Amino acid sequence: MSEQRDSRGMPQAGFIIEHQSSDHKWKVLRNIYSGPFSDVYVVADTVTNEKYAMKCERQEGNSRPVLKLDVMVLMATKGLRGFPNFVAAGRTDVYRYCIMQLVGPDLGRLRRTRPERKFSLPTALQILGQTLRRLEDLHNCGWLCRDVKAPNFCIGVGENESTVYILDFGFARKFVDKEGKIIPPRTAAALMGTFQYCAVSAHSHKDQCARDDLESWFYMGIELLKGPLPWANIDGHKNHKQIGEAKVAIRSEPLRSEFFEGVPKQFNEILTILDQTSYFDRPNYKKLGDLLSQAATEHQVTLKEPLDWQNNERMQQKAIFVGELGESHQASAKLDAKDNANESMDIEFDDMPPKEGISKSLSAEKSCTKNVETARTEK
C-alpha cells in the first residue's frame, strides 16, 4: 500500500486500498467527512475509474463500532432497489472499511433548500412511497433501522436521481430469529435513534419493532410536508422525555387537529393505523401505500410528476455537485450546522434505562453483530 495516511493512520488522497481476497484496488480521491472514529471518502476503481463511496471506521478507542452493521445490512439487501450496492469490505490494522455505491445529497439537506423548508405535495408523497417500500424491504430481510429520518435517505446521481436510497444502518438490529419469528421484547432497551423521530415507545426505553420504524417514517413525512416538527426546538439531550410527551400530546385534541392542519387527511388515518399496530404485528404496508395514493388523488396530483430537485435548477445543481462528491448525510449536517442548529443528533443513550434488563439490552446488541467477521473480506 502507499503511504498517504494522516496522523491517525486513516487514508488520505492518493492512498491505494487493496482488497484482501481479490485483485481489486481503489484509489482515494478525497475525504468528504472526518469524525473522531470514522471518515467517508470518494474512491475510484484503479482499472475502470468508476467512483464509489468508502466508509472507514477506526478500530482503536471506538467503544461502539457500527460499520459492521452497515456491512451486514448492505449484504442482506444486496440487489434490492433503493439500497446502495455493496462492493467490498475489509480491514487493516488501523481501520475497517466498506466500499459501496456513491449516492447524492440527503433528503434533509434538500428539504432545507426549499421555501418554508418543505417539499411540494407531489414530491413529498413520492418520497414517502419510496421510503415506505425501502422499510418494507428492510423488514422483510429481518432488520430494523431504528433511525428513520430524512438525513438517512439520499437521492441517486445521474440517471438514478429520481430514486431514493436508504443508508446508514449504525443503529440497525435483527428483529427475527433463524425461523423468521419476531424476537420477544427485552425488559428494557437503550434509547436508539434520533430524538425528533424515534417512536414514543423508545422514549420509555422499550424495545423497538417494525411499527416503530414506521412511526419515525410518519414523523419524517409530516416534516417533509409541513417543515420542522412542533418539538424541533426542544433540546432532547437535556430532556428527551419532553419530546416524547409532545408526541403523545398530538394524538389528542385540540393538538391533533393543529398537528394535521395543512396535510392530507389520510395522514390522520395513518397515525391511527400505526397506533393500533402491536409489537408482534406485521405492519399493513399496502394500506399505508394506498392512503398515500388516495391523498394524491384527492389533491389532484400524480405520483409520476418530476421531483422538486428535477424541476428546480438550484436544487438540481446542488444534487449533482454533492452527488459527485459522494457526500454522506454526516457531511451534509456538518455543512448545514449553522442553518440547522436545533436538529437532533444520533444517540445511543440519553439517560439509562431501568437497571433491570440493562445487561440483556447491551448483550443483545453485541450478539446481533458478532458474525460480521465472516464478511469483512467479502466482495
From Swiss-Prot:
Q: Which reaction does it catalyse?
A: L-seryl-[protein] + ATP = O-phospho-L-seryl-[protein] + ADP + H(+); L-threonyl-[protein] + ATP = O-phospho-L-threonyl-[protein] + ADP + H(+)
The annotated region (Disordered) lies at 331-379
Q: Which Gene Ontology terms describe the biological processes this protein takes part in?
A: male meiosis chromosome separation; regulation of protein localization; signal transduction; spermatid differentiation; spermatogenesis
What does the record say mutating P283S does?
Answer: In hc169; restores fertility in spe-27 mutants by rescuing initiation of spermiogenesis
Q: Does the keyword Transferase apply?
A: yes
What result is annotated for mutating S216N? In hc188; restores fertility in spe-27 mutants by rescuing initiation of spermiogenesis
Q: Which residues form the Protein kinase domain?
A: 26-302
UniProt feature, compositional bias: Polar residues: 360-372
Q: What class of enzyme is it?
A: transferase
Q: Where is the active site?
A: D147
Sequence positions that bind ATP: I32, Y33, S34, G35, P36, F37, S38, D39, V40, K55
One of the entry's Gene Ontology molecular-function terms is: protein serine/threonine kinase activity
EC number(s) given by UniProt: 2.7.11.1
A GO CC term? cytoplasm
* Effect noted on mutating G90D: In hc174; restores fertility in spe-27 mutants by rescuing initiation of spermiogenesis
In the record, the effect of T194I is given as: In hc92 and hc143; sterile. Failure to assemble MSP into fibrous bodies and absence of spermatids due to spermatocytes arresting at the diakinesis stage
- Read off the Gene3D superfamilies from this record: Transferase(Phosphotransferase) domain 1
**Which residue ranges does UniProt annotate as crossing the membrane?**
none
What Pfam families is this protein classified in?
A: Pkinase
Supply the alphabetized keyword list. Answer: ATP-binding, Differentiation, Kinase, Nucleotide-binding, Serine/threonine-protein kinase, Spermatogenesis, Transferase
Described by its record, this protein's role is as follows:
Serine/threonine-protein kinase which is involved in spermatogenesis. In spermatocytes, regulates meiosis and the localization and assembly of major sperm protein (MSP) into fibrous bodies. In addition, may suppress the initiation of spermiogenesis downstream of spe-8, spe-12, spe-27 and spe-29.
Q: Which family does it belong to?
A: Belongs to the protein kinase superfamily. CK1 Ser/Thr protein kinase family.
What is the protein named?
A: Serine/threonine-protein kinase spe-6
Origin species, per record, is Caenorhabditis elegans
| Classification of source organism | Eukaryota, Metazoa, Ecdysozoa, Nematoda, Chromadorea
User: What gene name is given for the protein in this entry?
Assistant: spe-6
